[in-house]
Every structure is written in C-alpha cells, then in structure tokens.
Amino acid sequence: MISPLAYIHPEAKIGENVEIGPFVFIDKNVVIGDNNVIMPNVNILYGSRIGNGNRIFPGAVIGAIPQDLKFKGEETTAEVGDNNTIRENVTINRGTAAKGKTVVGNNNLLMENVHVAHDAIVGNGCIIGNSTK
C-alpha cells in the first residue's frame, strides 16, 4: 500500500509489494526493490538504491549529499542491500567522488540515530548501535 500523502517522483522505480507510509519523499533516480516497508517521514533521495525486504523506520534519510566540501554534484549513490532494519533517524549519505558509493550490505541492523558517512561500506550481518557516527 502506498499512502496518498507520500510523494514519489514519476521517474522513481518502485518494486512489488512495497508499503510506503504518509509523508515519505522518494526522489528521482531512486530504485526500490520488492517487499520493503518504508514508514512515515522517510526521505529517500536522488541516487539511492534499496534492495528487497528492508524495513525503514520514521525519520530515516537515505541518499543525502555527502558532508564533504570536495563534493561538487558528481553522480554518486547510496546503496542498501536486502533484509536490513534501518531504525529511526538513521542517515546514509551518498558517495563523494564521481561514481562513488556508500554501501550497506545485507541483514544489518542500524539502530536509532546511526550515521553512515559518504563512501563507507557496511558489510553483511552487522549490528550498529544507537547514535554511532
């Protein structure tokens, strides 16, 4: 189900059986796989790639531009694999250099207020505790 209060850019690609809550913002150049739950007030921004079976809790921001003064608008991505739990207010920034990427693998738990910085790679099966930066 997609809430009528969500905004999904017409160029975004959304998979099958995706739940999208109210006040979610999904930007252009975003790909979201199947069987995801995206709860209210989540922002999935330009260049984000979300796999299958993820749960994204309220206030998460995925794909914001990197907090790096070297960034000049290059095409970069934030990539989230499959079966992750991304809790409240988690931020995952895009990569910095051209074709750079920030990656969160599969089967991870990112607890509340975690920040995954530009160009970071989180492997598979990780648990990252509250407010880790």
Locate the predicted segments by residue:
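Structural signal for interior beta-strand "rungs" in well-ordered beta-sheet cores
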Residues: 2-133
